Design a protein with these regions (language model features):
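Hydrophobic alpha-helical transmembrane segments
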Residues: 1-63, 100-201
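Glycine-rich active-site/cofactor-binding loop and its immediate structural neighborhood
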Residues: 55-87
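Basic, amphipathic juxtamembrane/active-site segments
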Residues: 74-114
Length: 201
């Protein structure tokens, strides 16, 4: 089970916004770049001013980013804006945005730098395995349990928690460790999906 499974419901809530954007000549690539810029600026702020209270921004920015990601996909598919450049921007933008938004956790008190770096590596590995499925079988794997939407929810909630209760940062390393395990599990599941689909064919 992963939050990706409720994506169609989320998209239906954004459809009116999508049509408004299309009417005003906003393209899928514009939205992708806006999400990337928002992530980079937020990450830079959190790194330069590593104060727990500022992590209150994280759930807000992550929610906006997820909405923008949904909108760029809808514009691409439903408004005939799918391009090779768009695919490149989408995939690289997702990875860069994840790094930009989650790297600041490294600068929080009580955070072990190696654990945060390991978690970021596992995040990249997970997305690579999802793309590997598309390379081999033509269908990208979004298998869980810790996909992009799930990460946004958990890390957004943690950002909210430590901004309100800074003492909770003593549990930072436990969360990074659990997240790394879940990410590795997700990577394995995505690779297994490749093998199962290949076997069925």
């Amino acid at each position: 089970m992963t939050l990706y499974q409720i994506k169609p419901l989320f998209q239906s809530l954004l459809r009116a916004t999508m049509f408004w954007l299309y009417k005003h000549h906003v393209t899928a690539n514009h939205i992708t770049l806006a999400a990337l810029a928002l992530s980079l600026l937020t990450g830079l702020l959190l790194v330069l001013v590593a104060q727990p209270i500022l992590f209150l921004l994280l759930p807000i920015v992550l929610f906006i980013r997820m909405a923008l990601n949904a909108l760029d996909g809808m514009l691409a598919r439903e408004c005939n804006q799918q391009t090779r450049l768009g695919a490149i921007l989408n995939e690289t933008g997702d990875v860069i945005s994840d790094i930009a938004l989650y790297l600041p956790f490294l600068f929080l008190p009580e955070s072990n730098a190696l654990l945060v770096i390991l978690m970021l590596f596992c995040t990249i590995l997970t997305e690579f395995c999802g793309l590997l499925a598309q390379t081999i079988n033509g269908i990208r794997s979004y298998a869980g349990p810790f996909g992009k939407s799930d990460r946004a929810l958990i890390f957004g909630l943690w950002g909210l928690a430590v901004s309100i209760y800074p003492q909770w940062m003593q549990w930072n390393n436990l969360l990074w460790s659990i997240a790394s395990i879940l990410l590795l599990w997700t990577a394995i599941n995505r690779c297994r999906s490749v093998l199962f689909m290949s076997a069925e064919r």
